């Protein structure tokens, strides 16, 4: 049997992982500006953490979760999304305590798992970046979080992004709308897809964002949630809309957007861009004011979003956005002869300890092959070290781009290479 990676997974090799590191680092910098701190939760959780919060009738729970019983007969699941684990951690660690500053702002990054048909930008092990903000029911929190997502997408280079906005109202508004939707869809039940016929019984709002053609036709004239908002829900949505306009953020009200998870209320949103004629959601989220209490904590407002890293990178690639990744070596040492082996090791280590990205030859190759390696590594400078250089303690350092050279001592390289580096036209940070 040929051993290969499981279906729906990928090996992220160095050329690609550099892009991942850039995106993750970029997200960290943006989130830091908004006073978010990182939280890391387990990759697996108790089954109930996900099933009860995400919703027993959602596709995630009924079709897509990787769940199993461990050797202690505990029902475990690999996390399929990030919000429920973060809320569980928030409650379990009593981060709602009075001494903790509010609102509490967290971000997370890491792998998630869903058993679904693998396709471009959608794998069974995928990676998510997300944020969660606890303790503020102020509509300004909704807007700040949406704007932070827009800030990230714009600065990372995603083009043609449109903000789709909707509200699910408070529980009372949602219940009234749910019944209106049942009344509207029940006579059309036989025209719905099999999945939506089931959803009509269990969670009729999910029929609205079905991708099946027959379902799209059925909901064309469905009642709008906006007609069922009570005063509280309408006031919240109006405030969010007005603040977005005040900040110059364009949006589209999309009343068929409901999101795939059951815990949302009030504001929900998606950032969508078009790739090769298809609409792709690049980031999505919303408000979930009941989730902390559901996990046994006090009544606490919550708002957050998540985005898939694989899909983000796919969109950047399709849009021709080149990430500014710096892979070049600062120094490459070509080694000539056994007599230079020890000194080359000392020298490359001294350079690294000064903060330079440095490499040397270990394979006793001909100089031509070593110079080729220096070019492959895009080395900025090149040092050739042979036995004669070791004896004289003088070497030539070459700018590998302009071919300019300087003659310096080994001691100078070991102690103050930045002076040589700058002399050859490069700048140290």
Curated annotation (Swiss-Prot):
Keywords linked to the UniProt accession: Aminoacyl-tRNA synthetase, ATP-binding, Cytoplasm, Ligase, Nucleotide-binding, Protein biosynthesis
UniProt-listed CDD domains: HisRS-like_core, HisRS_anticodon
Superkingdom as given in the UniProt entry: Bacteria
Enzyme class: ligase
Chain coiled-coil ranges: none
Compartment(s) where it occurs, according to its Swiss-Prot or TrEMBL record: Cytoplasm
Annotated GO MF terms: ATP binding; catalytic activity, acting on a protein; histidine-tRNA ligase activity; transferase activity
Catalytic reaction(s) noted: tRNA(His) + L-histidine + ATP = L-histidyl-tRNA(His) + AMP + diphosphate + H(+)
Entries under PROSITE patterns matching the protein: AA_TRNA_LIGASE_II
Pfam families registered for this protein in UniProt: HGTP_anticodon, tRNA-synt_His
Assembly, per entry: Homodimer.
Designated name of the protein: Histidine--tRNA ligase
Source organism (scientific name): Streptococcus pneumoniae (strain P1031)
